[in-house]
Design a protein with these regions (language model features):
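Amphipathic, small/basic residue-rich leader segments at the start of a protein or domain
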Residues: 1-100, 121, 412-418
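Glycine-rich beta->alpha junctions and the first turn(s) of the following alpha-helix
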Residues: 3-9, 13-14, 74, 219-324, ...
């Protein structure tokens, strides 16, 4: 199989439509929701839900590429399409992209670790009448990237055949919209990672679907953040939370193999290139706006000249373009592998590392070149700079992903290389 570098026609058509949405509905409201962090853009959410339903989908999730009987067989492009959608929406506003209705990380966890019956049960709601959200609850105070240190516990009540969960989760992206029962939204859920056997380490870790409105769950607070302010980030407390036995994703039997941990990692292998795509969208927004401002000032970027003949600004802009394109190619490889059912743990982490680096560098350089105007709220350059950093932090920090890359390349285990 070969990777095609030309954008498939179905993807190009989607990008054309989304660019209008990104420009007119997202970019135009960026500043307001940046300065009013916990307001909810209900009109955008409702519009996107209606639009996605009209195209046969209910959320930003990869569509089934299986051809209908008798139809021409085409290469799978589900994750490639999703990456292109996310990049364009993040180009509009990455905070808005993060509140686009759908399953998000919560649905990705069900997709990666759930049974066919669980996927049918929990994922169908995203194509319902109302916008619906799901979130993943993994991070804890003192247990961020070290998943083996998770202290949230799930104990089986033999009498009722229910799991009883206790713990607290922090930095839950979309936690409020996924769990709080808003009249405008459908019934969402959160996926809580907890240990069913503390002595087993990562092997005892499992994910549980907790439906919105479940007793014992409370939103403790919403974070005030540096960037992505249109998206809510919650602290969630779980006190004697009871969920049905069948809401555990995967087997309830603890074995020596780290089955639960592998379920979490499978989720990230699928989503890290998509996080990278969102960062690339932010970087492209900053770079394109910078070039527009330079053009207004009659500053020409002369491509094709030897480097020593270029001005400092020309070198900077060309370097920014190189960084952007190289990062996008890594994303394309990772999502192509996901579409073709190839193991992409290495490529997934590589794309995340590269995007986390370049989006920070490109947005910072754009602010520098713009000078005081880049630092001013008159333009969005300073906002893109603030929005950029999260790409390197969530869904595996740059440091963690560098470890993943090194282990794969050198052939070391997690114990051998920390």
């Amino acid at each position: 199989m070969t990777i095609e570098f030309e954008t498939p026609k179905p993807i190009a058509q989607i990008q054309f439509v989304l660019k209008t949405v990104a420009q007119e509905m997202m970019r135009s409201q960026s500043r307001y929701f940046d300065e009013n962090e916990h307001d909810i853009p209900f009109s955008y959410i409702e519009f996107m839900h209606t639009a996605m339903k009209s195209t046969g989908g209910g959320s930003l999730t990869p569509k089934d590429d299986k051809p209908k009987e008798g139809a021409e067989k085409r290469p799978p492009i589900g994750y490639q399409t999703l990456a292109a959608q996310i990049e364009m929406l993040a180009w509009g506003d990455v905070g808005f992209y993060l509140i686009t209705p759908g399953g998000g990380l919560g649905a990705a966890a069900v997709q990666a670790a759930g049974s066919p019956e669980q996927r049918a049960k929990f994922l169908a709601r995203f194509a319902g009448e109302k916008p619906t959200f799901a979130a993943m609850c993994m991070t804890e105070a003192g247990a961020g990237s070290d998943t083996s240190a998770i202290r949230t516990r799930a104990v089986l009540d033999e009498a009722t055949q229910e799991w009883v969960i206790n713990g607290e989760k922090i930095f839950v992206t979309g936690g409020d919209k996924s769990f709080t029962e808003y009249e405008q939204f459908g019934k969402g859920f959160i996926v809580v990672w907890a240990s069913i056997d503390p002595t087993a380490g990562r092997a005892g870790m499992r994910a549980f679907v907790v439906e919105s409105g479940t007793k014992g769950v409370s939103i403790v607070k919403l974070e005030h953040k540096l960037g992505i302010r249109a998206s809510d980030t919650a602290v969630i407390s779980l006190v004697d939370v009871r969920v049905p036995y069948d809401n555990i994703l995967g087997s309830a039997t603890v074995e020596k193999t780290t089955t639960g941990f592998k379920g979490a990692m499978a989720t990230f292998d699928a989503t890290r290139p998509l996080v990278a795509a969102s960062g690339i969208g932010v970087a492209r927004a900053a770079l394109e706006s910078l070039k527009e401002k330079l053009t207004e000032q009659e500053v020409e970027i002369r491509y094709g000249l030897p480097r020593n003949k270029l001005t400092s600004i020309e070198r900077d802009v060309i370097d920014m373009e190189i960084q952007l394109r190289s990062a996008w190619l890594l994303v394309l490889k990772a999502v192509w592998m996901a579409d073709n059912k190839k193991s992409n743990a290495l490529e997934s982490s590589m794309s995340k590392v590269r995007a986390g680096d370049i989006v920070t560098k490109i947005t910072q350089k754009a602010v520098e070149i713009m000078g005081p105007l880049g630092y001013s709220r008159e333009f969005l350059f300073e906002k893109w700079f603030r929005d950029a950093k999260i790409t390197d932090i969530y869904e595996g920090t740059g440091q963690i992903n560098r470890l993943v890359v090194a282990r794969h390349i050198l052939g070391y285990s997690g114990k051998e290389l920390r």
